Design a protein with these regions (language model features):
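Active-site-proximal alpha-helix that buttresses catalytic centers in soluble enzyme cores
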Residues: 1-301
Length: 301
């Protein structure tokens, strides 16, 4: 008996055993795409005069972590969008808690004598931005780390919030009567840090200017007012068409609870909106323009 060839894919042959010409086209195309992508990344680091540009420090996106599997999926997709915008940039993920890889493990995998820019996937100042992330960076001997500002407040975040509200049914044009009856509750996670509340109020102010209706921040935990309390206050002022704007980076328990409290419409979390990837790179570039330090930068436009 003649042994069969275990490498032959019988589904890719003509009757009689002759291989199809296109049998390996898919794998060849994938290989060529990979080579082209790698070559493009290498060429992007070479200037017009042929000299090689310095390799930019890796970007470490620091997520909070969540028990909701949708959150991890969202963050991974967001990282892919960042890589698409800047293919030559090395982008890594590290979590503060709950999900792997944890931030200390990610930092330990980097060149201990190199540089890194840590961009918090967080929307305001608070304990994680001020303590947890800088301490994790400082714990790696020799690593020259910069901690970027949190994502908010920033006009790009406001544009993302606006887009999510429109997706949920917010009318971009409304009568004066409808405008007088409308409002928005900006639903955030909450923090004991007073600067986090300052940042949330600033985002609410920017969103109010964008929408032309009152916007008040409210919180899922820890801080006041709660989302239900803010909704009641809006109703007491005659605002009965009130939307809940989800000020969360990804789906999770808090985002779900806040959405369920909405008397009218509620928007999806910020998620993988294209503007989010642009904002992450903006914070990265801002941090690169400052002296290397593990102290978090101040949020600014």
């Amino acid at each position: 008996m003649t042994a069969s060839n275990p490498l032959r894919d019988e589904s890719q042959t003509r009757p009689g055993g002759q291989p199809l010409r296109g049998a390996h086209l898919d794998s060849t195309a994938q290989l060529m795409n990979a080579i082209t992508s790698q070559l493009g990344s290498q060429l992007s680091l070479v200037s017009l005069d042929g000299t090689r540009r310095p390799v930019p420090p890796p970007l470490v996106l620091v997520g909070h972590g969540s028990r909701d599997p949708r959150a991890l999926s969202t963050v991974r997709t967001l990282i892919e969008r960042v890589r698409e915008l800047r293919p030559h940039l090395s982008v890594h993920l590290g979590h503060i808690e709950l999900n792997e890889p944890l931030l200390p493990d990610t930092l330990a995998s980097l060149d201990p004598t190199g540089e890194a820019v840590l961009v918090p996937l967080l929307l305001s100042r608070g304990y994680h931005v001020k303590r947890d992330i800088p301490e994790a960076a400082a714990a790696v001997p020799g690593l020259r780390a910069r901690v970027a500002a949190p994502l908010g407040p920033h006009p790009l975040l406001v544009e993302t919030l606006y887009a999510r509200l429109v997706e949920a049914g917010w009318r971009t044009r409304m009568s004066d009567a409808a405008r007088r009856a409308s409002g928005v509750v900006l639903a955030a996670a909450g923090s004991r840090d007073p600067e986090a509340a300052v940042d949330a109020r600033r985002t609410a102010q920017l969103l109010a200017e964008r929408l032309g209706v009152p916007v008040v921040p409210a919180y899922a935990s820890t801080a006041a007012p709660t989302v239900p309390a803010a909704l009641r206050a809006m109703a007491a002022r005659g605002r009965h068409r009130v939307a809940v704007a989800s000020y969360f980076t990804a789906p999770g328990r808090f985002a779900t609870e806040c959405a369920e409290a909405a008397p009218w419409i509620s928007s999806a979390p910020l998620g993988t909106h294209p503007t989010m990837a642009r904002l992450i790179l903006h914070r990265y570039d801002q941090a690169l323009a400052t002296q290397a330090t593990t102290e978090p930068a101040l949020a600014s436009a």
